[in-house]
UniProtKB/Swiss-Prot annotation:
Organism, scientific name: Shouchella clausii (strain KSM-K16) (Alkalihalobacillus clausii)
Molecular function via GO: ATP binding; DNA binding; zinc ion binding
Protein name from the UniProt record: Transcriptional repressor NrdR
GO biological process, one term: negative regulation of DNA-templated transcription
UniProt key word Transferase: no
Functional description taken from the UniProt entry: Negatively regulates transcription of bacterial ribonucleotide reductase nrd genes and operons by binding to NrdR-boxes.
Residue spans, zinc finger unnamed: 3-34
Segments of this protein annotated with the region Disordered: 1-24
Domain ATP-cone: 49-139
Cofactor detail note: Binds 1 zinc ion.
Family to which the UniProt record says this protein belongs: Belongs to the NrdR family.
Keyword Zinc: yes
Cofactor(s) listed: Zn(2+)
């Protein structure tokens, strides 16, 4: 590793520890020449996960976008933000563990709804109404009936 101060190639690691929920390793280093200390982070390089939209367009997976949608569905509901953040991480982990580089948006939506139904019924119906694009009240009532039968 090259020293940022003197550009010398020789450095030694003084300390290593997990960082960012064990997604990276933080290392304290010291230059062997000028004794400058600095920090580096080592992370696994993840391949981008592409979402295939209904119209065939592709866009990179965005955990922020998913979280915004969940926050909107859970507005004025007793669902802690931390619960939603964990759900987003769980969905992303599930998608990445499948090993595919491209995933249909329908599959992502189903994973989200499956988890949201276990957390809050009202938020689930809100999310489903937008995600499944309910066209009329009959579709809405059908979804509510199915939800009530599950419970």
């Amino acid at each position: 590793m090259r020293c940022p101060k003197c550009q010398h190639n020789g450095t030694r690691v003084l300390d290593s520890r997990p960082s960012d929920e064990s997604r990276s390793i933080k290392r304290r280093r010291e230059c062997e020449k000028c004794l400058q200390r600095f920090t580096t982070y080592e992370t696994v390089e993840e391949r981008p996960l592409l979402i295939i939209k209904k119209d065939g367009m592709r866009e990179e997976f965005s955990s922020d976008k998913m979280l915004r949608g969940l926050v909107r569905a859970c507005e004025k509901r007793p669902v802690p933000l931390e619960t939603l953040e964990k759900m987003v991480l769980d969905v992303e982990r599930t998608l990445r563990n499948e090993g595919k580089q491209e995933v249909r948006s329908q599959d992502v939506g189903e994973l989200v709804m499956e988890r949201l139904a276990k957390i809050d019924d009202v938020a689930y119906v809100r999310f489903a109404s937008v995600y499944r694009q309910f066209k009329d009240i009959n579709v809405f009532i059908k979804e509510l009936t199915e939800l009530m039968n599950k419970n």
